[in-house]
UniProtKB/Swiss-Prot annotation:
Enzyme class: ligase
Enzyme Commission number(s) of this protein: 6.1.1.20
Cofactor section: Mg(2+)
PANTHER family named in the record: PHENYLALANINE--TRNA LIGASE ALPHA SUBUNIT, PHENYLALANYL-TRNA SYNTHETASE
Organism annotation: Methanoculleus marisnigri (strain ATCC 35101 / DSM 1498 / JR1)
Protein name: Phenylalanine--tRNA ligase alpha subunit
Gene label: pheS
Catalysis performed (reactions): tRNA(Phe) + L-phenylalanine + ATP = L-phenylalanyl-tRNA(Phe) + AMP + diphosphate + H(+)
Protein family according to the UniProt entry: Belongs to the class-II aminoacyl-tRNA synthetase family. Phe-tRNA synthetase alpha subunit type 2 subfamily.
UniProt: Mg(2+) binding residues: E403
UniProt-listed HAMAP family: Phe_tRNA_synth_alpha2
GO MF: ATP binding; magnesium ion binding; phenylalanine-tRNA ligase activity; tRNA binding
Amino acid sequence: MELTLNEKRLLVALGPMGSADAAVLAEKMDTRREAVVQYANLAGDRGLVDVEKHVARRYVPTEEGRAYMGKGLPERQVLESFEESIPMRDLQGHPLAKIAIGWMRKKGWIAITGGVVQKTGKTAPGPDEAAFVRLAEKGEIADGEGVADLAKRGLAIEEETVAYTVSITPRGRELLSQGLDLREEAGTLTREQILSGEWKSLPLRRYDVTKLPKRAYPGKVHPYQRIIDEMRRILFDMGFEEMSGGIVQSSFWNFDALFQPQDHPAREMQDTFFLGERRPLPAGYERVRDMHEHGGETSSTGWGGTWSAEKAEQCVLRTHTTSLSIQHLAAHPKPPVKAFCIGRVYRREAIDPTHLAEFEQLEGIVMDEDVNLRHLLGFLKEFYAKMGFEKVRFRPGYFPYTEPSVEPEVYVDGLGWVELGGSGIFRQEVTAPFGIEHPVLAWGLGISRVAMLRLGLRDLRHLYRSDIEWIRETPVYGGRR
């Protein structure tokens, strides 16, 4: 059996006594008690010693408790400061009155009538006073009657003392009888020891290279947050800047500015979280109004009907981050623009394994002279490739504010082709009211869908759980790809 030098020293020190307190062994071995406990636990794992833990609890006075020692509890001091009765006004002049009056009444020592404090004659010391006297005499006391009351009042505090008794086992004594080599073992070798050959005569510490080390659990970023951070880093590397905005948006920016008709089903109560707040319309909103009613100055016919400013002022929890994209474009109508947003959006969804009422969405826009659909497909293919999806394809799609529109799909082993968001080129009805004269490429995707594929999850709700074991076991690289 291979023992460390400290285990051997422990057995040698313990042998003559058979059993001893760790503090005694520490003095004999010229080391710390904590070190002895560590050596004993190692030897205990080998069956050479038994380690017994003893926990003793005691109460010691607090700073306030020490202030009363030799004088008595506040209520006793105040009670003994007057004869049979005293006006309340005079009693309140005592420095301990605020503490003592309540306790004297609670213990039944006094009665207060007409502003006069009268002793009741029932002033025998209770368990708390007896405990306080013992505490003052000894400086510490064990738990007992009245001690808990002192602790509740902040006059005493519990302290825990842990002691360890180490006893040698028959197996340990047998090993000790065979003799132990107490020479210092070398755990490392210097260059000089190797060159001179001195290492050949040194007692070398033995290592079991087949034994697994204790598993370490360092701090880890939540797997879902790690994927979000990865997406953000990829887009920064692709030359995008990040845009941000509030989760509360007016219906104007969330719907109307994106040429979504005011009677569209997505604007119904069952799909959107409407708020009681209203916000004024921005300058130039009339161009959006005209676009809805008759197509403005474009060849579009618009949606017809009468556009309602009141509906546009109604605030909602944003249903998509595209509301931030159009505001960014309105503030930067001249190219080049290359921006993205990662943010939470809100929908009135029935919660189940594939739907949540709130989730994260990624939104990207590119505006420049002469950009077209091929540029859009190139951006998307590069982004998904950097996310680890090697096979990407596109199929035609439809979205209210883009034309043409495409839906990107990625190939996942075991699942086949999976749709991951929507994209297209903003319609003229969206860009014209804000003086944007160049094409705007736009795309968005639900980050949670990507995360589920990367992490191999089947329930969307698991992305938001605080399961420490799951966080520990999930590979840092992001899991399945």
